[in-house]
From Swiss-Prot:
UniProt keyword NADP present: no
Protein name: Maturase K
GO CC terms in record: chloroplast
Species this chain originates from: Nardus stricta (Mat-grass)
Organism domain of life: Eukaryota
Family: Belongs to the intron maturase 2 family. MatK subfamily.
UniProt keyword terms in alphabetical order: Chloroplast, mRNA processing, Plastid, RNA-binding, tRNA processing
Gene responsible for this protein: matK
Family annotation (PANTHER family): MATURASE K
Amino acid sequence: MEKFEGYSKKHKFRHQYFVYPLLFQEYIYAFAHDYGLKGSESVEIISCNNKKFSSLLVKRLIIRMYQQNFWINSVNHPNQDRLLDYNNYFYSEFYSQILSEGFAIVVEIPFSLRELSCSKEKEIPKFQNLRSIHSIFPFLEDKFLHLDYLSHIEIPYPIHLEILVQLLQYRLQDVPSLHFLRFFLNYYSNWNSLITSMKSIFLLKKENKRLFRFLYNSYVSEYEFFLLFLRKQSSRLPLTSSGTFLERIHFCTKMEHFGVRYPGFFRKTIWFFMDPLMHYVRYQGKAILASKGARFLRKKWKCYLVNFWQYSFSFWIQPRRIQLNKLANSCFDFLGYLSSVPQSPLLVRNQMLENSFLITTRIKKFDTIAPAISLIGSLSKAQFCTGSGHPISKPIWTDLSDWDILDRFGRICRNLFHYHSGSSKKQTLYRVKYILRLSCARTLARKHKSTVRTFMQRLGSVFLEEFFTEEEQVFSLMFTKTTHFSFRGSHSERIWYFDILRINDLVKPFN
């Protein structure tokens, strides 16, 4: 416990230089245009009617808040000229965006400055490279096949937002900013049901996602920090086996001495008591713990995590959110794919002199499938098809030009193929392309009050080229013009693209 506290204090000490500017004493616009934020996201605020407000409006609002009489009136007389008026939706939405975006800009400054200072270093530490999403793809392709057990974790959200605010106290030395954050969260949301009642969440709207994303990332960063500590200390924790309390360090020392005289027994037994190498991968709100070794070690880690969230973050996590499965018999949802590692038999013919015989071996293969139900559900929600996948027209787009309609449908199709290009089976994607292509044809036919067959014949190859995906172009370049090439024949090929996070939200259904 003392080591845990010391490790935590060391972690806090690193962030003591993160002194946040006082929101009520400094002009935000001076920080918003700081050189450390030049490479980050734009600080412009987009309102509910698509009007853009610069950070200068944040400055004006803060100056207005400096006026003590106005602030007192807005609190003491909530129905008279108050700062956040629920009776006037525009002003409520407008001020909420300014305050949330302004606070997010302020708290992001130290992290941006830290990234800028790290970029000037000659060498980037290896563990920082492994934190990139790009490291997930080689892990799934190369190392995942050699593991045995999989723990699929749905990272829980804190039930009470006060937990998120308290986590910032470890890194924040600006108390007024914390009080302001509490005021903002309490004023704009139902404090006790912000996370549980998704439809009434005000902060999770698109206009306020920057602030909530910062709070969520702070929570995940704190959780992963302590998880790393538990992983480093796991080899030193005591182990209970057959009613005997064994100290791991001394036991392994004795086993090494015993293994000198009985090497065969040592190799078969020592793995049972030592923690194997564990791999941790996270994307958005889902994480994976995968490793080799005994099943009881995975159950031990499940118990660790349940107790960890209970005592470190003061809320109970349902054990069902941590699923423990054998990798060979499980299918898990990750990165928008349904992934599995099936074992398929492979017959190998061997020839020895005049005799030949067959040997059956089992090989593992990492299999990724684009989820048909969720993809069709997203298309149905966007009114491209029915719930059963039957294509329908898009009436709202009939006012656009023909080329705009073709471009929109083609771009959605290409983005879906681009995001799910890592799928080992493309049948679902071909079905999605068929839905979008026929929906586009019906939209054009509805616009011109004609039939689908007429427009298919009029546009011809131009209509098909709009749905010719980037992945098909890549594979077509691998073959010469004289070689017969059918993209359907290469349905098992996989290409991982690194820019999938910047694609439209439609390509990440229910994730």
